[in-house]
Each structure stands twice: as structure tokens, then as C-alpha cells.
Amino acid sequence: MAPGEAIVSVSYQSTTGVSKQLSLEVTVISPFSLTTDVFNPSIWENGTFDEATRTLVTGQYGFGGWQYTDGLDLSGYKTLTVELGNDNESNVSFRLFDKTSYWTKPATYDFGSSRKVVIELNRMIDENGVKIDPSHLYIIGFWSMGGKPIVIANITLAD
């Protein structure tokens, strides 16, 4: 389900044959919300995040992003596209961890001189060639050398 508005309908019939129906309007949010209550600029080292400009500045060798206590299941999607809104001046990479510790080996995608990375979620591997499981991702975000702004333009999932 894509971010936006949706109507959820619930129907129920009791054992005595009484039927009830309820429709709810819900807001579907992205698992990659760029709000200060969800985005953590200081997963490793002290960073800052400006919600209005979508700008992350990590500490030296820092990491900012999202943490999912129960894991995030992206196995139903084919790709994750991450786009920067400025040039990469601090060796920015996008990393996805399928374990709860930051000190494990993630799938790493370097931006290099590009402003965009496209991640094939079912083909993620770590630096040793070990598969990263998209069905339970615990930490996802941006690593950098630090001290330079990283403008997050867009993060999209596609199936």
C-alpha cells in the first residue's frame, strides 16, 4: 500500500445472523517518514536533522536514519530508490541492516558522484557477499564522513 489516504471496510456477522459493517478512513504513512519524531540523526555519533529542509548532518563517521524495533518487512517490494537533493560531499552511503546491532555488516550502497541509488531489495548482500534479508530490517539510513549537509530529496518503494 502506498502512502496516502485509504478506506478500510470491516464486516462482521454474529452467530445469530446480525451483520455489522464499519468503514474507516486511515492515513498510510511511509516507513521512511522524514519527521523529527521518527528520523534519528544520531544512531551513531551526534547528528542533526532539519525537518523543513530534509537535511541531515551526521557527526564524524556518523549514521542517521530509522530504527525498527520489530523489524521492517520490505520483502513485498522489488526496489527502494533513494535520491539526494544536493551533491555528495561527504562519501554518503545508504545502508540497510537485517540485524538489531549497528555493529553488524549491512548492505551498503555508495552514492559516489550520483544523487540516486536504486536498491534491488531481494539482491542485497553485505561486504562479504552474505545475503541481507529484506523481510526483517532493523536499521536503515545514511552514513557519511560527517559535517556536511545531506539533503534527502526522495525515498520510494516500488513493486
What are these regions (language model features)?
Residues E25-D159:
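Beta-rich carbohydrate-recognition modules and glycan-binding surfaces
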Residues M1-P31:
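Extracytoplasmic soluble-region selector
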